[in-house]
Design a protein with these regions (language model features):
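Active-site beta-loop-alpha junctions enriched in small/polar residues
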Residues: 94-96, 146-148, 174-178, 199-201, ...
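Flexible, acidic/Gly-rich N-terminal and inter-domain linker regions that tether
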Residues: 1-95, 103
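Glycine-rich anion/phosphate-binding loops
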Residues: 115-128, 217-220, 253
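Canonical Radical SAM [4Fe-4S] cluster-binding loop centered on the CxxxCxxC motif
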Residues: 83-125
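Short Fe-S-cluster ligation motifs
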Residues: 128-148
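Radical SAM/AdoMet-radical enzyme domain recognition
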Residues: 105, 139-141, 154-241
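Glycine-rich, proline-tolerant flexible connector loops at the mouths of alpha/beta enzymes
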Residues: 62, 93-95, 112-114, 142-154, ...
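Conserved C-terminal portion of the radical SAM core fold
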Residues: 145, 168, 219-283, 292-298
Length: 298
């Protein structure tokens, strides 16, 4: 199978970028700057914002001072959205394949210690569900499962993708982490995008919430989008689970991650999701500061 080569990238990797900027910790290095950002700085960011990214502009836009400029930011966001994407909205539908999981994440109702009936759709069942989704007019589909590669194998995903690719214009997956060769095999089968949430960029918080299982490896998780792009995938979905750590620090880290990927893998497009905490049954104890209301967004 053919791997996708990219122009030589001479910059640092994402682990180095986050570490040097203090964005793989609890964000305390940035807290003072955020709190001391003035309204005048927000106005300057609005005046010079042409759609190009800079960490300084983003810092101004998510600072407490920016709460007084919500309408101006909304107008600018709309202007840039229409300029880049036109007056269209791209919709996709998720198809849940399995809730078997080998990880033990404190915040997740699917973690392996929870005792409930687990299910994995057969290929035939998945195709039936996909037909219903297609009949509703959706042409983009996201195949989702908890993380257990023995239950939802590469072969399973490959077979399913080959049977779905004539029904949908775009097939993406949100499953477990893989290697470059595995992603390349799925790409050849018709899967063009991968969503992988870092959940939190704070190393200490990550270690606390992801107790055991393959997902407990912070660096492997962080490097996954690189492997996705190296395999030729056209769409890379990123996200942080808002509520696990300081949302402003997470936003800065997420933006730096995306900026790095765009520079290094220019053939792939990067998108964001903003998942948030919702109630879920858990046999595991979580920290006292974990709160459904802790993600105050502008």
């Amino acid at each position: 199978m053919k791997m996708i080569s990219t122009p030589k990238y001479l910059g640092p990797d994402i682990k180095t970028i986050l570490a040097e900027k203090g964005l793989d910790s609890d964000g305390r290095l940035w807290r003072g700057r955020l709190e001391n950002t003035s309204g005048r700085e927000v106005e300057r960011a609005l005046a010079c914002a042409t759609g190009s990214y800079s960490l300084e502009k983003l810092l101004a836009f998510i600072s407490p001072a920016a709460e007084d400029y919500l309408e101006e930011m909304a107008q600018l966001a709309r202007q840039l959205t229409v300029q880049r994407f036109g007056r269209t909205i791209r919709l996709y539908a998720p198809l849940y394949l399995s809730n078997f999981c080998v990880n033990s994440c404190r915040y997740c109702g699917f973690h392996r210690e929870n005792k409930f009936k687990r299910t994995r759709l057969t290929i035939e069942q998945a195709l039936t569900e996909a037909d219903i989704i297609a009949a509703e007019g959706f042409r983009d589909i996201l195949l989702v499962s908890s993380e257990d590669r023995k239950i939802v194998s590469i072969e399973y995903l490959t077979e399913l993708a080959k049977k779905l690719r004539d029904k949908f214009s775009s097939i993406s997956i949100e499953v477990y982490q893989m290697g470059v060769a595995e992603y390349a095999k799925l790409f050849e089968a018709g899967i063009k995008g991968v969503t992988v949430y870092q959940e939190t960029y704070d190393r200490q918080a990550y270690a606390y919430y992801h107790r055991e299982g393959p997902k407990s490896d912070y660096d492997n998780r962080l490097d996954t989008p690189d492997r996705v792009a190296a395999a030729g995938m056209r769409e890379i979905g990123l996200g942080a689970l808002l509520g696990l750590a300081d949302w402003r620090a997470e936003t800065l880290a997420l933006a730096e991650h995306a900026h790095y990927l765009v520079k290094r893998y220019w053939r792939s497009r990067v998108s964001f999701s903003f998942p948030r905490l919702r109630p879920a049954y858990s046999r595991l104890q979580t920290s006292d500061h974990l709160s459904l209301g802790s993600c105050h967004l502008l």
